[in-house]
């Protein structure tokens, strides 16, 4: 994200699994200042990302925050110099692309579903998915690659 990200744009931002920002980026939730309430999922996502108290502060005050503060409160995952944002984001995406797709998909599913349950339910989610990944071609490839001291080539199976 670069330049200003506010209101409608930030609702889209909040729906992302990971958020990177340029150092010059600023963020604001100006609904209340406009006599409105947050729509498009903002009131759902923001407190889950930054906590209820910080979400209320951002909504009620309508104050803008810079990228450094957004990083500090967990609104964004990483901040890069403006001229490096695209390059660094691409480098991170390339790093993720080398991961095991099935395991990545299941980690995401377990994390998000885990937010809706208690510890026992979260552990059950892990237990029910562990055989899937342990029997996967990707896991076998990871073991072979480790033994052969090479990078794995995952298939997503």
Please annotate each region the language model reported.
Residues 14, 24-75, 90-96:
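Conserved catalytic cores of soluble enzyme domains
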Residues 42-45, 54, 66, 106, ...:
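Hydrophobic alpha-helical segments typical of transmembrane helices
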Residues 1-12:
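Single conserved hydrophobic/aromatic residue that forms the stacking wall/gate
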Residues 61-65, 137-141, 149:
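Short acidic-aromatic low-complexity motifs
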Residues 4, 64, 79:
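Short aromatic/basic micro-patch
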């Amino acid at each position: 994200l670069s330049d200003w990200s506010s209101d409608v744009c930030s609702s889209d931002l909040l729906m992302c699994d990971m958020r990177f920002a340029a150092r010059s980026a600023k963020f604001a939730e100006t609904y209340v200042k406009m006599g409105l309430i947050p729509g498009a999922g903002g009131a759902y996502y923001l407190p889950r990302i930054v906590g209820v108290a910080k979400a209320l502060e951002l909504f009620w005050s309508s104050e803008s925050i810079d990228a450094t503060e957004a990083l500090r409160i967990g609104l964004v995952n990483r901040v890069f110099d403006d001229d490096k944002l695209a390059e660094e984001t691409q480098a991170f995406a390339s790093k993720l692309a080398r991961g095991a797709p099935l395991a990545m998909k299941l980690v995401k599913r377990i994390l998000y579903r885990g937010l809706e349950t208690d510890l026992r339910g979260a552990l059950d989610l892990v237990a029910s998915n562990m055989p899937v990944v342990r029997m996967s071609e990707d896991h076998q490839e990871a073991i072979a690659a480790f033994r052969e001291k090479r990078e794995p080539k995952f298939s997503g199976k």
